[in-house]
Amino acid sequence: MDEKKINDRCKIIKNVFLFAFVAIIVKILYMNVVKYDYYANLADNKTYKEVTIKAARGEIRDRYGRLLAGNENQFTVQISINEFTKNDTTKDKSQANDTSLKIINLLEENNEKYIDEFPIVIKNGKYYFTYDENIKQYKDNNDIPQDLNAKETFYYIVDRLIEDGKLSESDRELKATDLQKKVNAAGYYPPILVSKWTFTEEREKNDWLEKYRVEKWLKENNKKTTNITAEIAFKAVRDYYLIDSNLSDAEARKILIVRDLIKSQGYTKYQPVTIASDISEATIAQVEEYALELPGVSISNEPVRTYPNKTLAAHILGYIGKIPSASESQYLNNEEIKYSKNDMVGLSGVEKSQESKLHGTDGYQKVKVDAVGNITDKLEVVEPVSGDTVYLTLDKDLQEVTESALERAIKAAREGGVYESAYGNVAVSGGAKNAKSGAAIVVDVNSGEVLASASYPSYDPNLFVTGISYDDYQALQPKNTNDLLAPSPLLNLVTQGVFQPGSTFKMITGMAALEHGLNPEYSINDPGVIWMGKKSYGDAVWNKSRSNHGITNLYKAIQESCNIYFYTIGTGENRVGGADPNAKIGPEQVMEYAKLFGLDDYTGLYEDLGVGGESKGKVPSEEAKIDSTKTMLKTYLNKVAKNSFTDITKDKNPEEFSKRIEKIANWCDEENTPTKAEVLSRLEKLKVKEDDLETLADQIVYTYLNFAKWTVSDAFNLAIGQGENAYTPAQVVRYISAIANGGTLNQLYVVQKSISSDYSEVDVKEPKSEKIDFKNSDNLKELIKGMKRVVTEGTGKKVLGDLGVSIAAKTGTAQKSTKIPTDNEYDYLMSHLSAYNVNKAEVLQVYYKLRAEREEELTKAKIEEIKEQIASKDTDEETKEELKKQLEEGVSEKLAETDRINAAYLRKAIKELNHKITDDDIDKFKETYGDFAWAVSFAPADNPEIAICVMIPQGNTSTYALLPMKDIIGQYMGLNSKSSNSTDNKTDEEKDDNLQEDSINFSTQLKK
């Protein structure tokens, strides 16, 4: 090659380098001169970040300023994500996985509680989605059959609300989204997306599976299944994080707890993740000692919610937790209050209702970070502003006494012995072995302020402050989920427990009669029992000892709880001889006065306890009974008559089937109840199969039509607080307060005021009340005379008579005559097959056949739902494609393997093989529920200040409900404690046997 060519090439290379150099210089000048401001601002934005400084939540204090819920700076274990994952450069070794396992093991070794939100649980070698468990728990807690899908569950709730009178029959025909609004307005919030007919937990599960691309993993690993089980998902997520195959699934789950927490929270590198709070000094020392082995793990100090009194007033205070996914947009898009995804918010009670006041304003710290997100310098700091302080109407001391007294009374009812009180001990015989829960509420009769409210058993809201563990949450669930009365720590019986009030209702019947002309001196000669045909309606003294109350006026009737007197004045007719009461009264007037006393309404506490914090009973009515019967009849026919017509079936002709069922149900409205012969004729015209005629006619006539109308039995039950009467203790104490204060119905409330952290704003709650429109409110004084005699001469004498203060009271018991479900109904049924005269092999054969038929129905229904959603204009294209994919892959619905579902189908199989057996026959080996024990009072009787209501499910006798009142009144009135307490050898129950009130549910008797 000649020299000239070489020189030419060198020149070319030089020129290239020169051009590049010039271009670089020009670019530098351009960036530093022309675009300096732009790039300087961009650099600042990339290197300066704001790190949130959490604001303390506002405190909650009692009426005197004593702390009920506060905050304390706790040491927490946090993970800085950039340090945690920065060395994960190979597929063979993951520093993040190693660190995750080490920190969880360290926390466990030190008995520290840590946040565990990984949605797959492994128990006894089986894998479960917590999403599925939450759906099961929701159904159990709300007495919903486990085999119902989302749509069926929603309409099951709707039918129940119609039956309770909270929705109308016409509401059922509304568009699903509009109906959902009505259901919500009634205080019920089913976790169901009606637009897609799926549970919110199902949607969350699908989102979670999508996040980890589990379907893609299935294809890559040639897994030919559309049913993604918890075990399959676990393996997929394990592979996603490249967890060492030598580790067990239990160890892998510890890693996944940390990895999933980080991923699900969506934290940026400079925002740490809290994995454990309130850790011990020993744990702090170990984390610092092993710092080199735990990259990214550090100790921090931040405000954490604390409840210093643990379980005290837990149901009023409520608890906090992470923002529910279903409510995420509501919080994160809030323009007035700024929330971040990891904020803790009030989920129940005052914590929920006062969320906007209690939530503080976070501060921030402006920091400088390097290229990989590490903090290199701390700059500006804006301090956080704590939330408002909320003051309650509660008196902490009275609350403590109320809770303690209630718990001791329940124990005394169950075990007997001595109820120990500073104001005088009381000997009791016990025997109410299933008395395990109860409620007590104390209110100011003049304002409606709640001074104390106790529900037993309770719970410690501290469990929720950093996220409750799965095991802790399960421990708070009823031990027997089949039993509606099983103790449930999270349930506030004061405002959410609806029960028959028994004889505590009798003052309403008395007031209705007085307002319509009754002379309180009007007397009957009580024989102890009324016979109407073969049916008896007796006093408690008659049922126990064939005794009676003799000559009885209103005062004595209240004192001794004479049922027959209230039958008489509640119907305006004397059925035991002598003159009728001079009162134009019947069930309509009793219902009217029950409503005047607020028993058809919420008490007002729902405003302070958050959505869902208060339920309410309904005053019974003839219309409600007919509607309820129609709903039950339709439910029955929908289940048993789906293939009972010769020309149609429920599945193939749903519209015509519904029309015929509606027509049958409307027979309940007829003035003259159709006879069996008439019903048989009508069913034939509706083309019911000959084989089904007799069975359907018997059920329609004798189970439904004959009990649709209002009867004398219903009128009697209404008058004495039995039958369809059912109210919360809060509703009852509100009505008793109205008697005490001369006829003013107060809204109950528990939030007194709030004060901002800088004391610049004070928001005081104004009491709400209305004067009841009585004809003569002086009639209330006649009721009070009788209530005072309960304490001076009646059932309350031995418990409250020695307090040295005038007290007005009334006791009551109400019977729940049904059987107590076992904690394993399937095993119960299997263990008694021989008594049911059925063969085990045959029963199981029918059992599996019935399950298969139901699964086929569910699958068909699901396919139809999917097709409807695809055809709907409201469904977006992305969702339509997903639904089409589901149809292509094949839809297969399976019944869950739960005790409730298994037992339901086993029971059906038994009845199919033995047509003569009834549910009563099947359940005859079970215990019967004990009576509800009630007591109400107010004191001082002549100038009332407080009213009290105590209720103990299965307490058997009302004496036990009186016991807590001794301590409550003593504490409130500041009475001197007894210097020496003595107990009678004979228990109060034995002395007062002849004074106990009626506990018979006549409608139940008649049905039997």
Identify what each model region corresponds to.
Residues 1-385, 396-400, 406-439, 445, ...:
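Membrane-proximal periplasmic segments of bacterial cell-envelope enzymes
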Residues 33, 410, 740-743, 972-976:
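Short, hydrophobic alpha-helical segments
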Residues 69, 75, 368-383, 394, ...:
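Beta-lactam-recognizing serine transpeptidase/beta-lactamase-like catalytic domain environment
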Residues 96, 395, 399, 732, ...:
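Short, charged, low-complexity patches
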Residues 390-391:
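Acyl-group handling in specialized metabolite and lipid biosynthesis
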Residues 762-769, 778, 979, 983-994:
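Conserved catalytic/cofactor-binding microenvironments
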Residues 943, 953-972:
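Amphipathic oligomerization regions
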